């Protein structure tokens, strides 16, 4: 019996030693673009980031309602952004409740998915090509809607009349913007307010189709 038990243990040791890469998996921070756009769950995760950025409750300003930034209500969280806004903390260079950076980050997630997450490289259903096609059509529609949503959020906060009296919109993000491109501030011009609205409506129409 001892010989049998010893043989089993020895065989097990050889089994594990022979498979060095059995548990050789990648941790999250080692996953690159080539992995992201091959694995359907990871690809969809990029798009879902744009969903996660949407406020899901009315008191989304650091647990405060936006009314706390006016005379309608008062907050006792003096370190919050709405308190700073109420106390006159808004300047041309600092908006305590601004969503500029966050919204454009969300748009980058959407555009990255539109450019990479709908190709033949990623399969959302490996057994039925027709189902895979339908899933991609649905995800494409969601992407266009999310792009319209985030442009609308930016337009609400930053669109309006300029010094010359013309109604201006916001810089349109119709593609993935790299860090190098983002550093070229002169490349991003504000179109007219109507042009921004037209862009949003066009994306909504694409989402419907």
Give the positions of each predicted feature:
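Aromatic-residue-lined binding/catalytic grooves and analogous aromatic/hydrophobic interfacial grooves
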Residues: 19-24, 201-208
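Sec-dependent signal peptide recognition
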Residues: 2-9
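Membrane-proximal, proline-rich intrinsically disordered regions
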Residues: 19-70
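Secretory-pathway/luminal and periplasmic proteins that interact with or process carbohydrate-rich
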Residues: 55-62, 74-75, 150-162
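Short, flexible, mixed-charge acidic loops at enzyme active sites
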Residues: 162-179
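Substrate-binding clefts and substrate-entry loops adjacent to catalytic sites
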Residues: 178-188
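Conserved, well-structured interaction surfaces
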Residues: 44, 80-160, 186-196, 206-209
